[in-house]
């Protein structure tokens, strides 16, 4: 039946599909059996080997179940001597993988049956290239081919991998391959999608595009892989041997091997602030040597400066796309320019005529590139020596190669000891990406030591440091006399980590400066001029100890920032509205914090290999983090709390047994009773734990109760359980679980990072999306009001609820988080978080200011509901925001593309929608 319908499809489409299709030499002696997209890469390898006279072939399986032995055997050449069966799965409990076992079964008992071996490929999303297929055919030519092999990895533990063959270009005739290295949200990927459409729609060429990303949000690594050819493209893998490479971020020259695989006589385009001799001076020797060895033509352009002159901010994509068409000549330049401008209207028309005209200018200025003279003497340059460091071996041998996009080259042995998925904390600190165009410069003269800059920083890359006399001796930078009696005789400095900063500018925006001096203490400067600050950061972070023990970090905003952030350098977007809240919680409670994280933006920037932003303090204490799904993150966190309670109950039982014992020393009984009395108080349990741990460690070999307490010593200090998720998880998919957990009455803290859309998946509408806003699945503006999650939660009467916006009231944010954590029951904190999906016209460098505007105009309200006050006879509800300036409400909406687009596309309906939105606010 299936065969019959496949024949019908062939008549309609012209594409022939059989149950099993053979490709290769009629008299093939070595044959691969496979199914899926890997068969296209295999066809390229087979063509290559057949051109050299080798007798090879492949059977592509199109109908696997039910498996027809009759049709399969009919497809296999009678001349076959050895067969390799490729499976994209691993069956540890079986004698082989499914397709391999089926093929063996077909030949079981057959006379002169071929030798059959099986192998695995493509697991963990590994690319499978023709060179790997060549290794399989090479294996089949051996007198005793390796069975149960793997390709695409280096297995130096169980030794199943086949030797990797060198990558070679096997695309069709006239194939042009290109790679573009970009920065997430710089528009590179979008521009390349348009390039493929332009070439595909205006020429007879076949086109293909693959896009690879790291796990970071905007500001992360992207690589676009494009192919254009005169014949159908069968390359089902990323580009390994490009004719053209564009590097849109000059910092990548030192971070990634951007020239790897670039063909002889190829072209290279670099977006850089350097010119001529200065550029040649700053290029790594390895890169210059490659240019000379392979006769590469090198072009450069300062697209960053051009974009700023035009008014496009950091959006260099259109300029560089124009340069690509001009350099490569893939299609006539005039046609490319004409089509690019058509796509600009299509892509940006909704954002207004001004945006369209700016992008038109970007197209025209894409021709301002220059050619760099490649010195033939570069061929003899030595590689730069590797910088010495004292970092852990795990960082140098695993984390850094993965960060350099070389993770696929790591051998299996590199992952010994972390097979269960456990990952080291604090690995984000070793990235030092240096991808910001501008970073803040501290002007000590104008600093009033308020620490507001550190408070709002999304990446914890600007911090206050207080130096004692000894620490000051080694400091090679300017400091101020520290303000505050507790810092008597000490000095103060705001230090920027320029290599981890993403350059959003929120710190400079919130800086009040010194009214007497008339200027801000922070101004945004070019990264290049601030690179010497990297050494100052290194000194402060390594040699200046935390002074948080000298202040009450929960007392006010300033004090909170003397606490070391235990959430730092995450992969969040530049200007992210979410991470300042997560960072603040880690500063206040991080040494005893446990986090159950919903899947979404917060899970991606919090725990993606290899960079983990959750880290530890000087004592090795830090948050314990785990990720669950959208739909059960609250239940997951509740499970953590209940498990913690159970383990602490065992500790308490052991202590009570010891207290009742006649042989237990008095000082032990006293310490145990102190813990029992204060176990539910963070400070008291911490103080008791410091006494108890050395006591039980000393006695655990002689006392069973002490042994039990020692076994669970990490649970002596009261945990601060946080459940973190976005509005998609909290308002929508996981709402049932959230409701169940707050109804349980257990002592958990839920933080809702409310961006009012599904941020991680591209801005789809959620129940948190406000009336009138454009989002995916609400293209003409949402027609129903936002769900009032906070007020719903207050109906229980025993749930602490707060609605906060850091940029509007920093002190209220701190107070609400502090109260929520201290409340002995369920708490829900809903935090307003501007997002790139909102389309802030002022840019994400104004995300904190946007929060302030939202509250001032009445779009977002600040309030707290504390049931503990009711027990004191007080009103549990407290409205913290002032009377709104309703006259500013419509202007606020117009400042965000998600609302402004509605007015542009649906002017007649927009007025009514916005009026209703204001009324419901």
Regions found by a protein language model. Name each.
Residues 1-26, 124-195, 200-205, 213, ...:
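Active-site phosphate/pyrophosphate-binding segments
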Residues 3-152, 160-264, 267-317, 578-584, 588-594, ...:
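Thiamine diphosphate
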Residues 43-45, 69-71, 94-98, 127-132, ...:
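Short acidic, glycine/serine/threonine-rich loops at helix termini
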Residues 66-67, 82, 86-97, 172-184, ...:
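Active-site cofactor/cluster-binding pocket
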Residues 72-91, 211-249, 353, 363, ...:
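A structural-propensity feature for long, helix-poor, extended segments
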Residues 336-337, 349-500, 508-722, 773, ...:
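Ferredoxin-type iron-sulfur electron-transfer modules and their immediate structural context
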């Amino acid at each position: 039946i299936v065969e019959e319908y496949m024949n019908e499809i062939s008549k309609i489409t012209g594409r022939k599909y059989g149950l099993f299709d053979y490709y290769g030499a009629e008299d093939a002696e070595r044959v691969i059996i496979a199914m899926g997209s890997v068969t296209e890469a295999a066809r390229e390898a087979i063509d290559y080997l057949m051109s050299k006279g080798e007798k090879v072939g492949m059977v592509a399986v199109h109908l696997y179940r039910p498996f027809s032995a009759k049709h399969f055997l009919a497809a296999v050449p009678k001349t076959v001597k050895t067969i390799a069966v490729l499976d994209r799965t691993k069956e540890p409990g079986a004698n082989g993988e499914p397709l391999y076992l089926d093929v063996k079964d077909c030949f079981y008992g057959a006379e002169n049956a071929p030798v059959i071996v099986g192998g695995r490929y493509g697991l963990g999303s590994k690319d499978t290239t023709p060179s790997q297929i060549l290794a399989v055919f090479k294996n089949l030519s051996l007198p005793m081919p390796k069975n149960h092999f793997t390709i695409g990895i280096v297995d130096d533990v169980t030794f199943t991998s086949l030797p990797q063959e060198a990558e070679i270009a096997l695309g069709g005739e006239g194939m042009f391959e290109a790679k573009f290295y970009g920065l997430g949200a710089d528009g590179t990927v979008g521009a390349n999608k348009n390039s493929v459409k332009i070439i595909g729609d205006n020429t007879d060429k076949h086109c293909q595009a693959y896009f690879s990303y790291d796990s970071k949000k905007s500001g992360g690594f992207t690589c676009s892989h494009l192919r254009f050819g005169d014949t159908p493209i069968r390359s089902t893998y990323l580009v390994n041997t490009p004719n053209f490479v564009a590097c849109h971020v000059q910092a990548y020259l030192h971070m990634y091997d951007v020239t790897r695989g670039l063909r002889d006589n190829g072209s290279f385009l670099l977006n850089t602030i350097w010119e001529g001799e200065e550029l040649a001076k700053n290029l790594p020797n390895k890169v210059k040597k490659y240019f000379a060895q392979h006769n590469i033509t090198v072009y450069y352009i300062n697209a960053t400066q051009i974009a700023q002159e035009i008014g496009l901010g950091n959006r260099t994509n259109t300029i560089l796309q124009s340069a690509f068409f001009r350099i490569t000549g893939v299609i006539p330049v005039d046609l490319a320019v004409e089509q690019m401008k058509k796509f600009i209207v299509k892509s940006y028309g909704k954002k207004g005529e001004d945006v369209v005209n700016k992008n038109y200018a970007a197209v025209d200025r894409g021709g301002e590139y220059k050619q760099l003279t490649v010195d033939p003497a570069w061929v003899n340059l030595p590689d730069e020596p590797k910088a010495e460091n004292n970092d852990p071996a795990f960082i140098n041998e695993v984390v850094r190669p993965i960060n350099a996009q070389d993770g696929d080259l790591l051998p299996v042995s590199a992952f010994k000891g972390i097979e269960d998925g456990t990952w080291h904390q604090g690995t984000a600190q070793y990235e030092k990406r240096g991808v910001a165009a501008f970073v803040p410069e501290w002007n000590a003269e104008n600093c009033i030591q308020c620490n507001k800059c550190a408070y709002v920083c999304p990446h914890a890359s600007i911090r206050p440091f207080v130096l004692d006399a000894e620490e000051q001796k080694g400091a090679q930078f300017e400091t101020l006399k520290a303000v505050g009696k507790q810092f008597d005789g000490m000095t103060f400095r705001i230090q920027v980590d320029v290599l981890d900063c993403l350059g959003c500018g929120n710190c400079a925006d919130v800086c009040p400066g010194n009214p007497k001096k008339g200027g801000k203490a922070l101004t945004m400067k070019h990264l290049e001029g601030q690179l010497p600050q990297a050494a100052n950061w290194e000194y402060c972070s390594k040699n200046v100890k935390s002074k948080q023990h000298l202040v009450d970090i929960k007392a006010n905003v300033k004090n909170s920032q003397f606490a070391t952030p235990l959430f730092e350098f995450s992969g969040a977007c530049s200007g992210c509205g979410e991470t300042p809240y997560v960072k603040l919680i880690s500063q206040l409670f991080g040494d005893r914090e446990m986090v159950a994280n919903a899947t979404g933006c917060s899970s991606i920037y919090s725990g993606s290999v290899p960079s983990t932003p959750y880290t530890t303090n000087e004592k090795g204490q830090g948050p314990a983090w785990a990720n669950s799904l959208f739909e059960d993150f609250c239940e997951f966190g509740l499970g953590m709390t209940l498990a913690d309670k159970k383990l602490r109950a065992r500790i308490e039982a052991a202590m009570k047994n010891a207290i009742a014992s006649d042989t237990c020393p008095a000082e032990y009984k006293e310490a145990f009773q102190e813990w029992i009395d204060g176990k539910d108080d963070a400070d008291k349990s911490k103080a008791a734990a410091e006494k108890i741990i050395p006591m039980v460690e000393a006695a655990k070999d002689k006392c069973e109760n002490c042994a039990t307490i020692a076994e669970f010593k990490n649970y002596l200090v009261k945990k601060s359980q946080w459940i973190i998720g976005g509005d998609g998880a909290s308002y929508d998919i996981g709402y049932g679980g959230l409701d169940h957990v707050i109804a349980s009455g257990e002592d958990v803290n839920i933080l809702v990072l409310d961006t009012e859309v599904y941020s991680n998946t591209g801005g789809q509408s959620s129940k948190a999306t406000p009336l009138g806003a454009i989002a995916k699945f609400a293209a003409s503006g949402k027609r129903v009001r936002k769900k009032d999650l906070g007020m719903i939660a207050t109906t229980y009467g025993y749930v602490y609820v707060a609605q906060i916006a850091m940029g509007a009231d920093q002190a209220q944010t701190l107070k609400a988080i502090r109260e929520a954590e201290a409340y002995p029951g369920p708490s829900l904190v809903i935090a307003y978080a501007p997002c790139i999906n909102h389309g802030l016209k002022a840019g994400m460098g104004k995300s904190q200011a946007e929060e302030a505007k939202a509250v001032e105009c009445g779009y977002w309200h600040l309030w707290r509901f504390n049931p503990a006050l009711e027990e004191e006879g007080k009103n549990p509800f407290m409205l913290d925001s002032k009377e709104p300036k309703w006259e500013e409400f419509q202007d606020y909406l117009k400042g965000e593309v998600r609302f402004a687009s509605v007015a542009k596309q649906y002017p007649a309906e927009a007025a009514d929608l916005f009026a209703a939105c204001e009324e419901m606010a």
